[in-house]
Amino acid sequence: MQTHEIRKRFLDHFVKAGHTEVPSASVILDDPNLLFVNAGMVQFVPFFLGQRTPPYPTATSIQKCIRTPDIDEVGITTRHNTFFQMAGNFSFGDYFKRGAIELAWALLTNSLAAGGYGLDPERIWTTVYFDDDEAVRLWQEVAGLPAERIQRRGMADNYWSMGIPGPCGPSSEIYYDRGPEFGPAGGPIVSEDRYLEVWNLVFMQNERGEGTTKEDYQILGPLPRKNIDTGMGVERIALVLQDVHNVYETDLLRPVIDTVARVAARAYDVGNHEDDVRYRIIADHSRTAAILIGDGVSPGNDGRGYVLRRLLRRVIRSAKLLGIDAAIVGDLMATVRNAMGPSYPELVADFERISRIAVAEETAFNRTLASGSRLFEEVASSTKKSGATVLSGSDAFTLHDTYGFPIELTLEMAAETGLQVDEIGFRELMAEQRRRAKADAAARKHAHADLSAYRELVDAGATEFTGFDELRSQARILGIFVDGKRVPVVAHGVAGGAGEGQRVELVLDRTPLYAESGGQIADEGTISGTGSSEAARAAVTDVQKIAKTLWVHRVNVESGEFVEGDTVIAAVDPGWRRGATQGHSGTHMVHAALRQVLGPNAVQAGSLNRPGYLRFDFNWQGPLTDDQRTQVEEVTNEAVQADFEVRTFTEQLDKAKAMGAIALFGESYPDEVRVVEMGGPFSLELCGGTHVSNTAQIGPVTILGESSIGSGVRRVEAYVGLDSFRHLAKERALMAGLASSLKVPSEEVPARVANLVERLRAAEKELERVRMASARAAATNAAAGAQRIGNVRLVAQRMSGGMTAADLRSLIGDIRGKLGSEPAVVALIAEGESQTVPYAVAANPAAQDLGIRANDLVKQLAVAVEGRGGGKADLAQGSGKNPTGIDAALDAVRSEIAVIARVG
């Protein structure tokens, strides 16, 4: 029975029983505690907890699930998968244990003609929670199971939760006996290889708290109603119904293995365990990668993006270990599409994008693997030569930091060479790097990293932001901070306030000044005293949020004095705010235009907007074409000129998303959100920033450029409003100047410049040819005039200026070839560009037999010209910075050879 038929029978069975069929949710949900959806019931959690009323009493679904904690076990065993499909039926206060058991038993044992799976009832076993006598009784009544085929187990096995606080309850697992060839008799407590778990019925009745293990957590109490949550692994039941040994032989994964075997020209499952592991890694990870990309994840360096990157890189490396050097990821994605397409049509519809992203990661990683592998081989060899068995944390960190090697890849490669890795040392270096980054960020934001001084004010309540409605507000100073420390409350004229010339932070109870967030930088403005302190005035240079609720104004006190408790006037610079709103609204316009031109997968990855300028980062593989860039600019400006109304309103998060409002991926939002709408459906986003009231106020938007800022992430930069006009005026002036200099009309400038560039390149080529011909002539003369020191022929010569290291390597090979087979050494040094002094040394085999090493001689050159160098016995090179030492350097080489040749 094919997998798509297995899925259809499951859904049909429960729909006939009155359940509502619910589509699979994305594997990514807006839950900061959950990296990926890992169970079928996740999308129903609010119903189980009583937080929302379910629109149906019972439901059925087949949910895409991803679990990655056991990623290193994938392939080594045949039981682990990172992606799986969980078929489930759910009851929200409707039926309970009896109903769940009756429905499951019917589907498993009914004949194929009756819509069931036709399993042999005599081969079905179950387990129950150790004190669940009711479940034992029901299995006996409903299914007629004998007591010996109902086994009791503890909390770790038969009490289910998601692993985080939420719904939980005792469970009953259903197992199928695969026969004596898979293990000993005695039920699942004896062998879970022979007795394969195919279905788990969870009697969801409690709520759990925090915990550290599968058994160590507190039961908080009963749920508002008793629920049913069941999960049948589609891959597991397919294994049984297709009568194969493991999930890798089902119709879901075997096609991927066959694709790999065809390309590798090696058979799978012929007794080579290491190769079989690689086949299984490729099959599992390719499928998971396709699902992740399909659901909007792009390769990255943290979070979900890092998981995807790690999966793809394990695929690529496993393929190389199978002898596949050619690109294969595109073929793998196509095979996954063909195998999974009947169940997940989005993999077919979105295949071009999925394949493009996966192949781009393959291309990038191949470059990383080539350079990083060389370093790994060097450090592994060095470690072994020293007699050590552990690769240092420092080396692992260098591989990660410089070459992008995940620690997991280093661990795998080390294990293959018989080495361990100092993971503790590596993680300490990583933690130190993160600490430095955090400290730098905190220092940039607050000039100090300790935010505990603000705790009292944070606990007292939030700053009221008035800036959506007014640019000037009366406020009270709640606190004054200097260098991260709160200034004690004092009276005016008493030391301790904030006086003229000081740089301090003021916390107000209300403010119209926008605090940096959402990509929009902080407002600039003033804070002025009132009444007896009206002489006080401060310029606001930055505004930041503490704990998302407290506005901290960084100010320079220009006159007078501020004291905690003072009433002040906080005001935004109107010109600044006007520019800021243009920049932020322009960002929304560009985002909408990108999605219109490229499609909905151009997902925002970050932004920055300030008066007159915007920067927008988005997930996309490969550069935009000139036509696409022009289109984005045109669509943006057409929307600006359309004078769309900009409307802002608050809405419940679920309703806002249902309306199509775009949320920033990975961002955590409150239940009630602010929605910014521009031109009805043209742009609808969740946003807490300040905006223009109609799009015409944005002014022209000029895209400056589009570039890559990382694998799979592109950046668009643009000028907005007056800055756009100024930029265009500069461009016009530049073009006019070029046209005047070239004595052609403006429209002919590009062709004339192209012609000049072509002529210049031809001239440079000819100059280079003449220069190298001259150098080679000098090399011939140098070889002819080689001096003899003992029985060694030596060419030690200063070359003409402007020579590069590459030039010297080329010449040194020519000269060495002309010196014959007797002992010979060539040392060349030159004055390079920008005061560099490149040098190179070569020693032929006969010279090496005498003990002359090029890498030793290059050190003699390095000392005299204050340089560094290295290489091997036959060829070494380096570069110095003191051209006055060139003659001394050559003399040092002559002296060293004289010593070795024992001359004089």
Curated annotation (Swiss-Prot):
GO cellular component, one term: cytosol
Entry EC no(s): 6.1.1.7
Record-level GO BP terms: alanyl-tRNA aminoacylation
Cofactor note: Binds 1 zinc ion per subunit.
Cofactor: Zn(2+)
Catalytic activity: tRNA(Ala) + L-alanine + ATP = L-alanyl-tRNA(Ala) + AMP + diphosphate
Enzyme type, top EC level: ligase
Signal peptide interval: none
InterPro entries to which the protein is assigned, alphabetical: aa-tRNA-synth_II/BPL/LPL, Ala-tRNA-lgiase_IIc, Ala-tRNA-ligase_IIc_anticod-bd, Ala-tRNA-synth_IIc_core, Ala-tRNA-synth_IIc_N, Ala-tRNA_ligase, Ala_tRNA_ligase_euk/bac, DHHA1_dom
Keywords: Aminoacyl-tRNA synthetase, ATP-binding, Cytoplasm, Ligase, Metal-binding, Nucleotide-binding, Protein biosynthesis, RNA-binding, tRNA-binding, Zinc
Keyword field contains DNA damage: no
Binding site for Zn(2+): H584, H588, C687, H691
Molecular function, one GO term: alanine-tRNA ligase activity
Compartments it resides in: Cytoplasm
Protein's UniProt keywords contain Zinc: yes
PANTHER family reported for this sequence: ALANINE--TRNA LIGASE, CYTOPLASMIC, ALANYL-TRNA SYNTHETASE
NCBIfam families from the UniProt entry: alaS (TIGR00344)
Similarity comment: Belongs to the class-II aminoacyl-tRNA synthetase family.
UniProt note: domains: Consists of three domains; the N-terminal catalytic domain, the editing domain and the C-terminal C-Ala domain. The editing domain removes incorrectly charged amino acids, while the C-Ala domain, along with tRNA(Ala), serves as a bridge to cooperatively bring together the editing and aminoacylation centers thus stimulating deacylation of misacylated tRNAs.
Record's function text: Catalyzes the attachment of alanine to tRNA(Ala) in a two-step reaction: alanine is first activated by ATP to form Ala-AMP and then transferred to the acceptor end of tRNA(Ala). Also edits incorrectly charged Ser-tRNA(Ala) and Gly-tRNA(Ala) via its editing domain.
Something else known: Was identified as a high-confidence drug target.
Protein name, entry field: Alanine--tRNA ligase
Gene (UniProt): alaS
